[in-house]
């Protein structure tokens, strides 16, 4: 079997290792930390999980493309996801809503969000419904498109259907020009105006950055994996080792040894050399 040495047991390194093992390669991963995950990590502090990475994972519903992608490696039916009712709460500084609250709730459910905003500002109905529609339009397109291998004729038919994504490019081009500041200016309600100005801590950001996650939150396609980021990474590491892969923890790589313009081995701690046919670097730095 061809031997591949992988640098880094983060999500990319672990997933690459899984696919290589499934396709007949012999692999081993070298990780300088003593746990898997890389930047996909979390800590337990008493009853709390401190998680600075995966606030949500795309693919928590069975109908999405990401669900099918993750399912090639993990059994998602055995993983519990939590779907939050409220995405974020924005504390408005200078105004209040008609109930006297200075908190603007961004609900994950689009119907709930629309009704909430219409209740706060009926006079902004046109702007609110256009805002919600911009998010709903994105839901009409599967991202990424499912591209399973098909026979010739069905493949041609699918290719013709994929032409509808040309319209999607036009939608993206339109939405990428509108920022939260631009949208805020359209509201008559001082409360909604200020809330959208503060959508990204007062920074001006394109609404496309907001709309994409909102579209998947509404469909419950982006849930939080119970257990946190480290538990998620550990599941992938367990899958990798079950496929026959090896992980060397606490083993920083000192050098990639090359010969005739090709990678031939890794020099790791204690000056141990691990020979291979190729090296795949999945380290950020």
Where is each model-derived feature located?
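A conserved short coil-to-beta-strand element within the FAD-binding core of flavoproteins
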Residues: 249-264
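Core beta-strand elements of the Rossmann-like FAD/NAD(P) dinucleotide-binding domain
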Residues: 2, 268-278, 282
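Active-site/ligand-binding neighborhood in enzyme catalytic cores
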Residues: 136-243, 250
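Extended, hydrophobic alpha-helical segments in both membrane/secreted and soluble proteins
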Residues: 11-16, 232-236, 240, 249-253, ...
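N-terminal glycine-rich phosphate/pyrophosphate-binding loop and immediately adjacent elements
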Residues: 2-143
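A structural preference for short, hydrophobic beta-strand core positions in alpha/beta folds
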Residues: 29, 247-249
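Well-ordered beta-strand scaffold positions
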Residues: 48, 95, 252, 271-272
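Short glycine-/small-residue-rich Rossmann-like dinucleotide-binding loops
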Residues: 54, 284-285
């Amino acid at each position: 079997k061809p031997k591949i040495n992988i640098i880094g047991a983060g999500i990319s390194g672990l997933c690459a290792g899984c696919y290589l093992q499934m396709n007949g390669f012999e692999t081993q991963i070298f990780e300088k930390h003593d746990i898997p995950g890389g930047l996909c990590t979390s800590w337990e502090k008493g009853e709390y999980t401190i998680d600075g990475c995966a606030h949500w994972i795309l693919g928590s519903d069975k109908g999405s493309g990401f669900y099918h992608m993750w399912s090639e490696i993990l059994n998602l039916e055995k993983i519990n996801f939590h779907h939050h009712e409220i995405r974020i709460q924005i504390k408005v500084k200078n105004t209040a809503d008609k109930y006297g609250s200075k908190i603007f709730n961004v609900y994950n459910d689009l119907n709930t969000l629309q009704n909430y905003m219409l209740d706060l500002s009926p006079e902004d109905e046109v702007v609110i419904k256009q805002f919600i529609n911009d998010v709903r339009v994105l839901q009409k397109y599967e991202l990424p498109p499912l591209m399973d291998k098909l026979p010739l004729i069905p493949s041609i038919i699918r290719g013709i259907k994929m032409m509808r994504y040309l319209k999607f490019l036009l939608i993206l081009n339109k939405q990428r020009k509108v920022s939260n500041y631009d949208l805020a200016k359209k509201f008559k309600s001082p409360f909604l105006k200020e809330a959208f100005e503060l959508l990204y801590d007062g920074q001006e950001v394109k609404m496309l950055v907001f709309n994409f996650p909102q579209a998947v939150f509404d469909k419950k396609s982006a849930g939080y994996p119970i257990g946190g980021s480290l538990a998620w990474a550990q599941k992938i590491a367990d899958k990798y080792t079950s496929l026959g892969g090896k992980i060397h923890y606490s083993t920083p790589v000192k050098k990639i040894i090359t010969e005739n313009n090709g990678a031939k081995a890794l020099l790791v701690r204690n000056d141990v050399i691990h020979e291979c046919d190729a090296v795949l670097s999945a380290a950020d730095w």
